[in-house]
Amino acid sequence: MPARVCHITSVHPANDVRILYKECHSLAQHYDTYLLAPNVNDSLSEGVHIVGVPLSTHRLQRQLQLGRVLRKALEVDADIYHLHDPELMSVGLRIRRQGKRVIFDSHEDVPMQLLTKEYLPRWSRKPLSSLYAQWERHCLSRYDALITVTPSILERLRRINPNSVMVTNYPRFQALPHSYGRGGQQYVCFAGEVAERYMHHVVLESLRLTTANYLLAGRVFVDAYFQQLQRSDLWQRVEYLGVLPPHEVGSLYQRADVGLVLLDYSPNVGYHKGTLGVLKMFEYMMAGLPVVATDFELWKEVVEGHQCGICVNPHDPQAVAAAVNHILSHPDIAQQMGNNGRKAVETLYNWATQEPVLLGLYEQVLGNLLSTPDNSPYSTLN
């Protein structure tokens, strides 16, 4: 019998790309795999048993309901539990006391993130960040292993728990068709969070200096910010498509000429260092789109190193427009950038390079409890 593993999220949707389509689907090829997720019907996805837990969408109310998560998790009776949300760290301790193995997957640098949370009074941010860091250390030092998505967070987590690895958020590679020189209206695009940190207001200002229109898709995070965008005289040049299911995002990319990912500098991404946890840039590259991206150190290594786009200051609409105009006015260069990006994802920045790290960590934590451990292709990664 294969070991049983259980991923738990109280915040992310059951169809989260990283959690379900990458980690859980990969694990289901080797383990009896469960995913506990909020407010969904029980179902099966490529061998993954999805189990719904009724939870409030209100942050404070949800804290009072975490007992439901714990009870459901213990009903699954897994050998290993993999947690995805900071609010679940106390649940992880309770599970650990039952003799189970626990992994925590840190998607964000929460202590740094708290320093910029707009909903928190400014005076409270540093004390709350410090308190969270202490609680995080208390919990995570007792877990069996930690996972994160980018080097800066990995460095911090290894000081808490040496058994920490990086499993980056690269896409599962699939060749998406794209062509240039189609004629007609040209577009820049973004599919993801409609949130201020992705600098959509700067994109709108850049449209004054280019003929491109903006294809925009994604969930609105703050209504006031979305309304601010809609009040702009440039909103008429935006085609907002709402939230697209994953299988329709590729069609958006096929319509576009340039992919934009202008993530703001912030403590959560190490300011100018940047993060590898943002999937969007690699999706554009996989789709054969030239990218215009924030000039983070990590992103410049990718974009400039593979000559697949241009990096700019995300606060400078003139720089954004200049980059877009350069790409749109040189279709041969755009085609080469797109080809370079796709090749880079096919060979380096894809989930197939990360899956062995995840599976190797599981095998190590579980103590080689695979049903056929002697034949495991991942034993050399322990």
Locations of the language-model features?
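A short, well-ordered alpha-helix in the C-terminal region of glycosyltransferases
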Residues: 326, 333-348
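Glycosyltransferase donor-sugar binding loop
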Residues: 40-41, 213-227
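Membrane-proximal helix-turn-helix segments that form the acceptor-binding/catalytic region
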Residues: 23-25, 67-75, 94-97, 104, ...
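Short hydrophobic beta-strand element within catalytic cores of glycosyltransferases
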Residues: 259-261, 283-286, 290-293
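Conserved donor-binding/catalytic core segment of Leloir-type glycosyltransferases
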Residues: 6-8, 147, 177-215
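Donor nucleotide-sugar binding/catalytic pocket of nucleotide-sugar-dependent glycosyltransferases
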Residues: 51, 133-177
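Conserved acidic donor-binding segment of nucleotide-sugar-dependent glycosyltransferases
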Residues: 305-306, 310-317, 326-332
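Nucleotide-activated donor-binding/catalytic signature segment of Leloir-type glycosyltransferases, i.e.
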Residues: 218, 226-253, 258
